Amino acid sequence: MCGTPRQAVDADETVVADLVTTACSGDRRAAARLLTLVERGGEPADAVAEATHPLAAGAQVVGITGAPGSGKSTLTDGLAASLAGAGRRPAVLAVDPSSPLTGGAILGDRVRMEAAATAGAFIRSMATRGHAGGLALAVPGMIRVLDACGFDPVLVETVGVGQVEVDVASAADTVVVVV
């Protein structure tokens, strides 16, 4: 599934290397902490990228996009639950609009994905943090972390999109447009 990251050089890299090893052994909290580091950016995110890049095995990435209210979350929930029920290890990155007050995700699609959560899929909601294009800037790095941790496929649900929100096409192997 995944190997051992290269030897750490300083304290921050040691923490990241330990998190990567723990996450790769199946610890979901460690995986969530790595995703948080990537989402926050900066040097810790760079250390995560460096540690996980050689471990990524090429998980299938499926982008799920469409207009607001078209059923993206329902489709994502059902697909993740079905994949988990078939013995796969799906992960979901649900990208939501950002709250103008907190900067966090407004809708929290993760809360509505009951079937997938019950079946054992890994689900992470995140905010766009004002980035246009339907995704957050951290999504490619987060996909790499999930891939390195052995999740396959990785489902990326975008915010409700218009004609200019096409970032998912560059991040996914397959794009599903829900109409």
What are these regions (language model features)?
Residues M1-A23:
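Long, basic/Gly/Ser/Thr-rich N-terminal segments
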Residues V15-G26, A31-V62, A67-S70, L75-V178:
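Nucleotide-state-sensitive switch-loop elements of NTP-binding domains
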